[in-house]
Amino acid sequence: MPSTTLPSSDVDLFATDTLVDPYPGYARLRDAGPVVRLDRYDAWALPRYEQVGAALRDHETFSSASGVGFGAGMNELMAGGVLASDPPHHTTLRVILSRMLMPRALRDLGPSVTVAAEDIVDRLATGAEFDAVSDLAEAFTPRFVADLIGLPQEGRDQLLEFGASTFEGLGPVGERTPAAMRQQKALLDYVTTTAARDRLVEGGLGARVWEAVDAGEIDEAAAITLMMAFLATGMDTTILSLAAAVRLFAQHPDQWDALRADPSLVPNAYLEVLRIASPVTVFSRVTTRDWECDGITVPAGDRVAVMYASANRDERKWGDPERFDITRKPSDHLTFGVGIHACVGQNLAKLEAHALLTALLARVRRFEIGKPEFIVNNTLHGLSKLPCRIVT
């Protein structure tokens, strides 16, 4: 039966406590309704799986062209990029990215990823304590992204800061916003100087972006936005998911034992990690026309919070959603999105994750972890630190 009252909530999606532990607040929003008014942000929230999926598939009603964040500054900076655009411009950018990042385009990268995964696991499987974030996930992922793009060695130490600041800046204006905006300007400077066209390695993804300019597919401004997208969104989500995998398997040793018994479950296990520990929590859209749900009308021109991480724990979709179960087969999780804005880099993320999990399976009997610490970021959730020891 449609709702007869306007559901609203005082849950603050961007309060520090929520960012560190978002799931209780998400559950309250799901219980409040399929569409919930967030008065403090003059926005609506879609916390349930069905409505999140519907919004992501309906780009004509839920537009990205006005930005996917909640603050005007970052939305203006990202305008016209692959995240913050609609067709036909988005289609042009997407075609260029897709042909670079499809599985067949990444096939040659596989052996080097496997070797690197085995090398890093060998170095950490000594019985000594290490940080699963900085020593494992952050030590593994950035090198592939940087090499794949063809970046010069200079300035690579800035890459992680670029990504975190982008996701931070997508939240509403707050005390951390100025630092995030400064990093965005530093990212633009990096792309136009340190990683300018004439400094990129021939044959890398960056050089191929500029080949699209030469072919008349895009202009130079679009090439810069694509380069910024590579650097801003190409690493953090994978890093966070890899660290989450270690935490989850340490906390659920029965699931690690099950994976060791049947390594063919690696792809499925990674999907379950992504479902239960979604690195990206929320983006926004703006409605282009009135949209009705459960008797509630969201007016045209309103901003809507599309809650990926909440949808992935929706009790209406998933049986016992708080349980980590590598046999669940959650192929329809929404961590990578769906529709025209589905994550174009998901094949690279899967390649890296599958290689690292496979390397860990070969050496690790169990993980012993200390107290996890979590990042504070407006649109990302995950670990900032995880003391860990590998038992072989």
Model-identified regions with their sequence ranges:
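Cytochrome P450
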Residues: M1-T392
